[in-house]
Structures are given as C-alpha cells and as structure tokens.
C-alpha cells in the first residue's frame, strides 16, 4: 500500500456547514438589543418593537464564543483503497468480513490486499487486539505517514445507524491523530444495491460531520478540529451520490443548530433569543421562509390562556410565540404540514418545584429540545427547498418560573379553543403551552402535524434514554414517521393511545386536569394533547424526553431534526 501522507485537497462537494454564525454570538459588544416583528393579520396590521436585555446583563456575565461548526470538504471517489493518499483511512468491517482461511489469512479481498501491502501488519494487529468486526470494536495501526483504523460493523451493516457509527469512529480517530484528510471505505459492498450505496455514503458523511462537531462556545480555551476533507471510497460516484451527500450536509447543519440551542444555558437562550434565531432563519432563506412572532399581548388577543399561564411568572423573560412558514413560489399543489416544538427555555417546575438530586433541574435548559429540533429542521429545509410542501414551524417559547404573578396549583386556565384545564401540577407545563400551539397549528389549515416535546419522565421509564415514544391514532401517519426515523437512523417506538386512561384526566370543576395518576404518564400526556387537535387533522406526538440529551457525552444530540426533514421530504 502507498504510504499514507497528506494529499492535495480536492474541490468537489465543498462544505461550509453553519456558515452563518449563531445569534448567540451577536450580543458581545452591546448590552441591549432591539428588534421589530411583523404581527399576523389575526392580531393587527401594526408592527411592535421589543427591547430586551441580553448578554451585557446576563447572569454570570457569560458571553459565548463564535460557533465552530465543522467545515469539511466531502466527496465520493472511485480511487482504489490501496492507492488512496491522505492522513487516515477508516475501513468498516463486518464480522463476516473478518473471516480467515486455514492459514489465518483474510478471506475478504480488500482486507487481503491491504494486509499484503502492509506485510501482514493488519492481520497481526487485528489478532492481537481481538478485533472480530463486532459493533463498537476498533483497531488502529499507526505509521510514520498516517494511520489505518478498522471499525466493527457487527454481524451486518444493514442500517443507517451502523454507518453513522462508522463515520463517528473515523471522526474520533481523526481527532486523536489531528488528521486533516481522511477516507472511509467498506471492506465489502456485496449485496448493496446502488441506492443502498448512496444512502450508506450519506450516513457515513453524517457520522463524520456530527462526530467532528464540538460545542466550544462556553470554554475559555478550545482545540479546533483539524479535519478538512473526507473521501468516501468504493460506493460510487456521480451526481446522485453527490446530491445525497449535500443533503446530509444540510441536515447536519440543522442538527448542529439544534445541539447548540439545547446546549446553551437558560441565561443565554431565552424566549426572545429563540425568537431572534427564528428571525435569522427567515432572513437567511427569505425567498422561501416567512416569520411571524407574537408577544404576550398578541397571544392574549388570540385567547392563549394555557400558554400565557405558564409564562406568567417569568416577568424578566417574557414569552414569544414563534411561527415560521416554508413555502416555495411554485404553483403546484402543496401538502400543508406543521411541526410544533415545546419551547420551555427553562423549567423550574413552578410552585411544584423540581427538588432533589433526581429532579435534574440543572438540565432543564433542554426542555426546549422539541423547539430546537423544529428550528433545526427549518434551517435544513431552507437549504434543501422541497417544492411540494408548505411547512409551518411553531414554537410557544417561554420559561416556567416562580413568582407572585405565577400560575398556582389548583388554578383553572382556558385554552384558545375554550376548553378549561385545572392545573393540578405546575410542573406539567409543557402540555399547556402545546395546547395553544396545536390549536394555532390547526388554524393554519394544515393536513398533518407532528409535535415534539420533552414531555414526560414516564417515557424514559418505558423506553430508556435513547428511544422516543410516538403516539398517534392514525396508522398511516405512524408508518410514515417510523419509516422516516429508520431512514434517518433515529430511534422511536410507537406507543398505545389507551383511551380508557382519559377517565383519570377528568376534573371535578373544569373540563380536565393537566396530569393523571403516576402510572401511564406518557400515555395520559399524549391523550391530553389530543384534546387540542382538530379531528380532521392527522397528528402524531413524539415524546423525546430521553434522546434529546446524552448523559454519557453531557451534550445535546440534536434528536428529531433528521426524522422531521426526512418525513417532510416524503410528503
């Protein structure tokens, strides 16, 4: 094999992920900012001007550094693996690929050829490290000119998750060796159709980009990624695979935005900052995305009593109701969709205060994980520009705090459809904000709605930290979303909508209470939301309380962006 060394950069598929800096970095020189929002025709024809303290008055005087998203040139190449030149070569191998003959030589032709070029070092290293191709295994060979990494794919590499893991392992190896130019290949592509190869290349690219990303905005010192280029070898070339790789780059940009929004603490990301981020997305893609932001007075005109009750205590950080609309100027009929995200930028629990070590109150900055996914999807779709859909992105952003003005246990609030809710737990606030958001979404004339919310701890008891729960009374919509998630490599599981449980949600003095008994909490939460969706609208609720955050990495995951984008494109 030719010595691994730095080769000249190639020009194809130049990537500039997240080229527009996040709004989090725009407030470093001025303690105040002001912006004006257009008011929807439902409220008024006038424009309101809002002034809000940020950055200079931030608790702790924290001011984020610039976002440092990966900028990697990605291309599919037909270069033979043994002829490739660069810093690091990563090979994905299944357990079957690692089979040996009676002389302990690889049966796999590519591994056999590589081992021959390396005078048996690949075979020796994999034996010494007990590398058998199992998922999660890897072995590294270092040379004066570079490195080769073998990555285990398990019994078979049949899902996007396997290829994401391969890309992430390659990114980790590149990071540890400070590689600038890397390549990724599969030991065998037998049995992969042309379409499967294209999808595999896209998943590998996704894994490398997201695996290279580190959120260093809040570190006093950070080490920037050295990775500049990725070659994907042996999976084909041409416009189709390049388009799919570009699609992966756009989705990754949305995922990274989602991660940054959730990672940023509540003293940085307030409801107003979420609104400004939405404005920035609309400004960047102004030919296809419009924006309306409603303040508290305008929400009051729309009778959003449930949402405003949650927001009432946060007098220093007032609520903003965000509505983005994606629509290309083509005349063809468009399917009308809505993506609704829970947008609690911080959740103290209110008077039902989150207390004790198990409350995880310190992580309640991630209670806007649904909103982050919705805004990340808006950014990605602004780049991808599908022509046959009209998509409404809706977030009722606010904080759930404690004050004399705040909502109390036992209060009765009225949603914008006239239904009354007895608040028996102020810490079940997300569903109250979503109630008015779902009503608003239905009023846009949409045909289908997906809402995403870090709604219940019960879903984590049922499904653990990595899997979202999907609730819908519509089998067709369930199938659409499950297929989109599978194609994206995100995990979800359809849960039952047990209607008999609704009896436990009835109030003695109002139409309903906002929480039921302890058992089946994820189901009763979904049944609550159903009360605010028009029967003519197909609706699915994703409880993403588990997968929006990685305890292992102590970081946001950007969960939901990929599935939402894939689902929109399939409509």
Swiss-Prot record:
The organism of origin for this protein: Solanum lycopersicum (Tomato)
GO molecular function terms attached to this record: aminopeptidase activity; identical protein binding; magnesium ion binding; manganese ion binding; metalloaminopeptidase activity; peptidase activity; protein folding chaperone
Keywords (A to Z) from UniProt: Aminopeptidase, Chaperone, Chloroplast, Hydrolase, Magnesium, Metal-binding, Plastid, Protease, Stress response, Transit peptide
Source organism superkingdom: Eukaryota
Recorded consequence of changing residue 354 to E: Lost ability to form homohexamers leading to impaired activity toward Leu-Leu as substrate, but increased chaperone abilities
Binding site for Mg(2+) 2: 347, 427, 429
Active-site residue list: 354, 431
InterPro entries linked to this entry: Leucine_aapep/pepB (IPR011356), Macro_dom-like (IPR043472), Peptidase_M17_C (IPR000819), Peptidase_M17_leu_NH2_pept (IPR023042), Peptidase_M17_N (IPR008283)
Subunit structure: Homohexamer (dimer of homotrimers).
UniProt-annotated binding residues for Mg(2+) 1: 342, 347, 367, 429
Induction data: Induced in leaves by wounding, mainly in mesophyll cells chloroplasts, and, to a lower extent, in epidermal and vasculature cells (at protein level). Activated by the wound signal molecule methyl jasmonate (meJA) (at protein level). Accumulates during infection by the pathogenic bacterium P.syringae pv. tomato in a coronatine-dependent manner; coronatine produced by P.syringae mimics wounding without triggering defense responses. Triggered by insect infestation (e.g. larvae of M.sexta).
Name of the protein described by the UniProt record: Leucine aminopeptidase A1, chloroplastic
Cofactor requirement: Mg(2+)
Gene3D superfamilies linked: Leucine Aminopeptidase, subunit E, domain 1, Zn peptidases
pH-linked activity: Optimum pH is 9.2.
Function description: Catalyzes the removal of unsubstituted N-terminal amino acids from various peptides. When associated as homohexamer, catalyzes the proteolyzes of Xaa-Leu dipeptides. Possesses leucine aminopeptidase activity against the model substrate leucine-amido methyl coumarin. Presumably involved in the processing and regular turnover of intracellular proteins. Regulates wound signaling and has a role in insect defense. Functions as a molecular chaperone to protect proteins from heat-induced damage.
EC numbers for this chain: 3.4.11.1, 3.4.11.5
Cofactor comment: Binds 2 Mg(2+) ions per subunit.
Result of changing residue 431 to V/W/Q: Abolished activity
Tissue: Observed during floral development. Expressed in healthy and senescent leaves, cotyledons (emergence from seed coats), pistils, sepals, petals, stamens, and floral buds (at protein level). Present at very low levels in healthy leaves.
Cellular component GO terms, alphabetical: chloroplast; cytoplasm
Effect of residue 429 to V: Strongly reduced activity but normal chaperone abilities
Record localization: Plastid, Chloroplast
Pfam families listed in its UniProt record: Peptidase_M17, Peptidase_M17_N
């Amino acid at each position: 094999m030719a010595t691994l060394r730095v080769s000249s950069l190639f020009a194809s598929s130049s990537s500039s992920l997240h080229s527009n800096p996040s709004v989090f970095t725009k407030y470093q020189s001025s303690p105040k900012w002001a912006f004006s929002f257009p008011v929807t025709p439902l409220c008024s024809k006038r424009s309101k001007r809002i002034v809000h303290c940020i950055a200079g008055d931030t608790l702790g005087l924290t001011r984020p550094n610039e976002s440092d998203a990966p900028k990697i040139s990605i291309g599919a190449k037909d270069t033979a693996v043994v002829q490739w030149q660069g810093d690091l070569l990563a090979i994905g191998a299944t357990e079957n690929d690692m089979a040996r003959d009676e002389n302990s030589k690889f049966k796999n032709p590519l591994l056999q050829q590589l081992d021959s070029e390396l005078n048996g070092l690949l075979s020796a290293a994999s034996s010494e490290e007990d590398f058998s191709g199992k998922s999660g295994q890897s072995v590294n060979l270092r040379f004066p000119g570079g490195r080769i990494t073998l990555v285990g794919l398990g019994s078979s590499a049949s899902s996007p998750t396997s290829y994401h893991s391969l890309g992430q392992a390659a990114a980790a190896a590149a990071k540890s060796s400070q590689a600038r130019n890397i390549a990724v290949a599969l030991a065998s592509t037998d049995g992969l159709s042309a379409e499967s190869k294209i999808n595999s290349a896209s998943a590998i690219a996704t894994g490398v980009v997201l695996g290279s990303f580190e959120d260093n905005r809040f570190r006093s010192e950070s080490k920037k990624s050295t990775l500049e280029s990725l070659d994907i070898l042996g999976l084909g070339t041409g416009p189709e695979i390049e388009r799919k790789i570009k699609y992966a780059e756009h989705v990754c940009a949305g995922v990274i935005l989602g991660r940054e929004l959730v990672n940023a603490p509540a003293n940085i990301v307030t409801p107003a900052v979420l609104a400004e981020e939405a404005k920035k997305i609309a400004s960047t893609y102004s030919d296809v995305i419009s924006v309306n932001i409603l303040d508290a007075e305008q929400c009051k005109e729309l009778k959003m009593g449930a949402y405003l009750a949650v927001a009432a205590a946060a007098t220093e950080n007032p609520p903003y109701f965000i509505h983005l609309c994606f629509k290309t100027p083509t005349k063809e009929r468009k399917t009308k969709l809505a993506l609704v995200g829970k947008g609690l930028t911080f959740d103290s629990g209110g008077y039902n205060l989150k207390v004790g070590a198990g409350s995880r109150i310190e992580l309640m900055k991630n209670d806007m994980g649904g909103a982050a996914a919705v805004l990340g999807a808006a950014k990605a779709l602004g780049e991808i520009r599908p022509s046959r859909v009209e998509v409404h992105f809706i977030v009722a952003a606010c904080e759930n705090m404690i004050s004399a003005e705040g909502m109390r246990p036992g209060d009765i609030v009225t949603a914008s459809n006239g239904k009354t809710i007895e608040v028996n737990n102020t810490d079940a606030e997300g569903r109250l904000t979503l109630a008015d958001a779902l009503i608003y979404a239905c009023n846009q004339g949409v045909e289908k709605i997906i809402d995403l919310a870090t709604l219940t701890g019960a879903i984590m008891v049922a499904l653990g930290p990595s899997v979202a729960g999907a609730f819908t009374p519509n089998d067709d919509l369930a199938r659409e979303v499950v297929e989109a998630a599978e194609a994206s490599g995100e995990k979800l599981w359809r849960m039952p909508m047990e209607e008999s449980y609704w009896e436990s949600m009835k109030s003695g003095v109002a139409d309903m209470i906002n929480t039921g008994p302890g058992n089946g909490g994820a189901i009763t939460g979904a049944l609550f939301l159903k009360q605010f969706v028009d029967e003519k609208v197909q609706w699915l609720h994703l409880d993403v309380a588990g997968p929006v955050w990685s305890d292992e990495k102590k970081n946001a995951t950007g969960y939901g962006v990929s599935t939402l984008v894939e689902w929109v494109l399939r409509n």
